């Protein structure tokens, strides 16, 4: 019978009434972007890795190699993005050897979306896949459930709103390589300054037609830790003692035992 199904809604209400709390969604805590230009494509990412409210890693690499000319940026669960990109990278290499031709970006896209769809979102990997092949330059985004998108500029992660604001206001047709790198870097910095889940440095990867990818690790370091201008160690006695109280929390008893007998 055609129509809407409210089975899941009724199930969720039943579980809530029986003290079963709904699972909380994991924040992607990242800013990643991709921008196409005249002769290729650029992807960029921040380098902050978080564990809840804690910064777990200040210089985490979020740009992953799939093949010499195909790279992807990952947001979501770090272990998932690392594992899934390594798996697809291996499969792409085997596919390239079997077909005796340069791997296509759409092949990596198809492998990724089929793998993620199979697990129904339980693999928390949100990816921007970019690369060049004999058919040209390509830029795609993939969500954890397997849905995909294509565009001239894309952004994912918790800082994607700030990044997309920069991309939409500054993108133009026929960008040069330098302009695309600057636009992607500015978009990542917008995420760094406006999203608590993003921070530290900016990584960039440039893929041009006819060339292998150029990985620019720590392309920008807007959060360099400066040296303190003076010492903040204070000598003992700087803070006055207003009151002193000594409490005996145990009694010490001494007993001598003669062991000569």
Swiss-Prot record:
What keywords were assigned to this record?
Answer: Cytoplasm, Hydrolase, Nucleus, Protease, Proteasome, Threonine protease, Zymogen
Q: Where is the active site?
A: 30 (nucleophile)
- Annotated S-S bridges: none
Question: Where's it found, cell-wise?
Answer: Cytoplasm; Nucleus
Q: What is its main location?
A: cytoplasm
What Gene Ontology terms for biological process does this UniProt record contain?
A: proteasomal ubiquitin-independent protein catabolic process; proteasome-mediated ubiquitin-dependent protein catabolic process
The UniProt function text for this chain reads: The proteasome degrades poly-ubiquitinated proteins in the cytoplasm and in the nucleus. It is essential for the regulated turnover of proteins and for the removal of misfolded proteins. The proteasome is a multicatalytic proteinase complex that is characterized by its ability to cleave peptides with Arg, Phe, Tyr, Leu, and Glu adjacent to the leaving group at neutral or slightly basic pH. It has an ATP-dependent proteolytic activity.
Q: What is this protein called?
A: Proteasome subunit beta type-2
Q: Which organism is it from?
A: Saccharomyces cerevisiae (strain ATCC 204508 / S288c)
Gene that encodes the chain: PUP1
């Amino acid at each position: 019978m055609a129509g809407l199904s409210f089975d899941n809604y009724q199930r969720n209400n039943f579980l809530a009434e029986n003290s079963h709390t709904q699972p909380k969604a994991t924040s992607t805590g990242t800013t990643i972007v991709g921008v196409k230009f005249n002769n290729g494509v650029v992807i960029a990412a921040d380098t902050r890795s978080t564990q809840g409210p804690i910064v777990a890693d200040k210089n985490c690499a979020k740009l992953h190699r799939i093949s010499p000319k195909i790279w992807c940026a990952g947001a979501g669960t770090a272990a998932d993005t690392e594992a899934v990109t390594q798996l697809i990278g291996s499969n792409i290499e085997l596919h390239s050897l079997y077909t005796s031709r340069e791997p296509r970006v759409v092949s990596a896209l198809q492998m990724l979306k089929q793998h993620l769809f199979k697990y129904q979102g339980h693999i928390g990997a949100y990816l921007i896949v970019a690369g060049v092949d004999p058919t040209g330059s390509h830029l795609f985004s993939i969500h954890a459930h397997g849905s995909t998108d294509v565009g001239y500029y894309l952004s994912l992660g918790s800082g994607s709103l700030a990044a997309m604001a920069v991309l939409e206001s500054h993108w133009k047709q026929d960008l040069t390589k330098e302009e695309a790198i600057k636009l992607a870097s500015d978009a990542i910095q917008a995420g760094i300054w406006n999203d608590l889940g993003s921070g530290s440095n900016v990584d960039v990867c440039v893929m041009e037609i006819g060339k292998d990818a150029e990985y620019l690790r720590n392309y920008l370091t807007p959060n360099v830790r400066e040296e303190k201008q003076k010492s903040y160690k204070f000598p003992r006695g700087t803070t006055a003692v207003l009151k002193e109280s000594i409490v005996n929390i145990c009694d010490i008893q001494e007993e001598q035992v003669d062991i000569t007998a």
